[in-house]
């Protein structure tokens, strides 16, 4: 059969390009979202978005382990290992390992930041406050398979050679965060009554910690 003649000036057949455009936009959005999510889990994200209240916390996290440093208030710390932010970083943990976000918590904190409804430096949070939004027991915050795979009894045995065993609940069970601090030097709780209790390197007695907290 003879081919139909092409008339000069006729428009070329139109192709539908919108599926390609939509596909490209979707790919770009997915890539951008994935990149943002990765950045969201980095310590630098905290200070970049919430610059004012978070700078000091990022600075404590970024310090080298086992050296002299400073806490979130700028006070000298004899050994940065006394701050959980530093010792956890040395074990490959980042901010999100402890500060596990929930949508309701993030929305609330975001509104407080936008409106300026927060104290500065930020109010210290204990393990109960850190787990409240997730409905997790305070003990489970630290004692779990991905962090410290131990029980309370294991902890008692681990420090049984100390004259005043900080994990022995003879005066009632206390939260881990009563002694172990993230962005300031940890505190030997036993010194509240026993001034002769052994204080780990870089840690503070209760009296020393109270003095710094009051000054801040």
Curated annotation (Swiss-Prot):
Record keyword Iron present: yes
Recorded superkingdom: Bacteria
Coiled coil: none
Any one Gene Ontology molecular-function term assigned to this protein's record: metal ion binding
Binding sites annotated in the UniProt record for heme 5: 190, 193-194
Alphabetical UniProt keywords: Cell membrane, Electron transport, Heme, Iron, Membrane, Metal-binding, Transmembrane, Transmembrane helix, Transport
Annotated residues for binding of heme 3: 142, 147-148
Binding site for heme 1: 46, 50-51
Electron transport as UniProt keyword: yes
Major localization listed first in the record, in broad terms: membrane
Cellular compartment(s): Cell membrane
PTM (free text): Binds 5 heme groups per subunit.
Binding annotation for heme 2: 95, 98-99
Family annotation (InterPro entries): Multihaem_cyt_sf (IPR036280), Tetrahaem_cytochrome (IPR012286)
Binding site for heme 4: 176, 179-180
Induction or repression: Is highly up-regulated by digoxin and other cardiac glycosides containing unsaturated butyrolactone rings, such as digitoxin, digoxigenin, and, to a lesser extent, ouabain. Is repressed by arginine but not by ornithine. Part of an operon that consists of cgr1 and cgr2.
Membrane-spanning ranges: 18-38
GO CC annotation: plasma membrane
Membrane topology designation: Single-pass membrane protein
Family: Belongs to the multiheme cytochrome c family.
Subunit and interaction comment: May form a membrane-associated complex with Cgr2.
Described purpose of this protein according to its UniProt entry: Probably transfers electrons from a membrane-associated electron donor (e.g. the membrane quinone pool) to the [4Fe-4S] cluster of the Cgr2 reductase via its covalently bound heme groups.
Identification of the protein by name: Cytochrome c-type protein Cgr1
Top-level taxonomy: Bacteria, Bacillati, Actinomycetota, Coriobacteriia, Eggerthellales
Gene: cgr1
